[in-house]
Design a protein with these regions (language model features):
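Short, cationic low-complexity segments
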Residues: 74-106, 288
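Extended, beta-strand-rich, solvent-exposed assembly scaffolds of outer structural proteins
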Residues: 1-69, 75, 107-284
């Protein structure tokens, strides 16, 4: 039986504790951080796999712990640290914003719609799809709306954000053929522009009132910066004019879809902020 299996694990296996949860699943855990590895077992419904441990930080004086990538985005001089560096240690970015705990994922949102069937819970509250949403509701701002629909239940506010840095080749030949460049499908005629400042002005004129993406110029590099304060997925395409030569997130990490033939896309990030400053518990609902 399941109960006998759990008892055998607890009796015979070191560094693993087994129990049956409220939904009837067998849960394996430890408080040492050792990896938990499984061999395939058809009888038990287990596939061969290994699960690495997590690192837990505790403040000795009970003050909040701040975790940041060492990037220009976070106020450091250069992009020596990236979100991917946090991911290798199992950390998300953790900051105090106006005295409240704010946690930002170390990876961008995926391209799947978040539904109740995914079992995502925040502070024990199931996050479900909203009326009017569909399989195309996959942007960070879509998922932010779903989370915030239940803020009064879980006590957390979600915000989206997305920002990329684009290297622009302003050589004359490239600019002359950049009349039908697009940003999120909106045509932006850049063929008459001579400077990145002109490009910024042209993009903002074309996108104004249509979409939450704003262009600016990075002060220390002169590169083009595209920002969505709601977390929209940002897609660019120079339609073969060779106008765009490199694209990254502002921390220097690779965008979702790498630049190819002048086209690239970058999905947004989500930050969760606790309204009362307490910890935020996230469950993904996935059972193996």
């Amino acid at each position: 039986t399941k109960e006998e299996f759990v008892a055998a694990v607890n009796s015979e296996i070191t560094n693993v504790d087994a129990r049956i949860d409220a939904d009837g699943y067998v849960v394996f855990s430890n408080d040492t951080g050792y990896a938990i590895s499984f061999a395939s077992s058809t009888e038990l419904g287990i596939t061969a796999d290994a699960y690495g441990g997590f690192v837990k930080l505790e403040s000795l004086d009970n003050t909040p712990i701040t975790i940041q990538a060492g990037s220009k985005e976070n106020g450091y001089g250069a992009n020596n640290g990236r979100r991917s560096d946090l991911a290798t240690m199992g950390f998300n970015e953790s900051n105090l914003v106006n005295g409240k705990l704010a946690v930002t994922g170390n990876v961008y949102v995926d391209d799947s719609q978040l539904t109740g069937a995914d079992g995502l819970k925040i502070n024990g509250v199931l996050i479900t799809e909203l009326d009017g949403q569909s399989s195309t509701s996959v942007n960070a701002n879509d998922k932010v709306a779903q989370i915030n629909d239940k803020t009064d239940q879980h006590g957390v506010v979600a915000t989206g954000f997305n920002q990329i840095v684009v290297t622009v080749d302003m050589s004359n030949g490239n600019m002359q053929t950049a009349s039908d460049s697009t940003i999120n499908g909106i045509t932006v005629d850049l063929s008459g522009d001579a400077t990145v400042t002109n490009v910024v002005e042209g993009i903002n004129a074309a996108l104004a009132g249509k979409i939450d993406i704003v262009a600016s110029m990075e002060a220390d590099t002169g590169k083009l910066v595209l920002t969505s304060n709601s977390g929209l997925t940002i897609s660019i395409d120079d339609t073969g004019s060779s106008l765009y030569t490199a694209v990254t997130y502002t921390d220097g990490s690779a965008v979702t879809t790498a630049l190819s033939s002048g086209a690239a896309s970058a999905r947004g990030y989500i930050t969760l902020t606790s309204l009362d400053g307490s910890s935020i518990k996230i469950e993904d609902g996935k059972q193996d």
